Amino acid sequence: GDDWQSIYAFAGSDIRYTFDFEKVFGKTSRIDLDKSFRFTQPILDVSSRFIQKNPLQLKKKIISKPSSFKKTVEIIENEFGNQNYLYEVFNKIEADRPNKKKWDVVILGRYNHLEKEIPDDLKSKYKHLNIKFMSIHKSKGLGADIIVILKVESGKYGFPGSMENDPIMNLVRADEQEFINAEERRVFYVALTRAKQKIFICTNSYFPSPFIEELKSEEYPEVSFDISSVNKALL
């Protein structure tokens, strides 16, 4: 199994069975799959660096293929909660689309109700893109050329969400939760690694997410940061 993608604690999954596999099941040998054919090396570098901030995650060194993009992760800041920022994101995707190839674009939300954030005419406006919405949990095991992650910000239904610290849920969670937002970090890792080519992360500077603040640091040179032109027009 892959401990980096263990995201079902809410259903009773216990990641200690991965960390302490040999203690539970007896003598074993570990074989790492050290090549990824799903996404490019910059996406791999960002996501693996991010997930291994938790010292309890198993350490792995994985290699992949190079990318044609100078920056493969782009953070789009939407300060005013205006849905029009998604048009800007999709204009960027259209501009990057090589040889008018029909790309698969998946919009990911930490929660299902975030689908209402998507403008009704998005699919009809961008007919050369195959657009769909999924929750991050539902997307596990799947992939798309481009991933757009909605509302990576703080708050109860943010990302990481404050609900992760629910005291009732903490009673059944593993001790590894001593590392802050451990489960949410893995969920975010799953979101990042659904992308084959490029990732757009949508956030709000008024409700900063610790994940965004981390990605904006010098540790992640593969990440670019931009303020939505919708916001610029309103300033």
Regions from the language model: what does each represent?
Residues 3-7, 12-15, 36-40, 80, ...:
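Conserved nucleotide-binding/hydrolysis micro-motifs of P-loop NTPases
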Residues 27-35, 56-109:
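Inter-lobe coupling/hinge region of RecA-like P-loop helicase motors
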Residues 2-4, 25-30, 69-72, 129-131, ...:
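Short glycine-/polar-rich loops that comprise or flank the Walker A/P-loop
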Residues 1-71, 161, 212:
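Conserved RecA-like helicase ATPase core segment
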Residues 101-102, 127-130, 134, 139-205, ...:
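Conserved helicase C-terminal RecA-like lobe
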Residues 21, 117-126, 210-219:
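Short, aromatic/basic amphipathic alpha-helical patches
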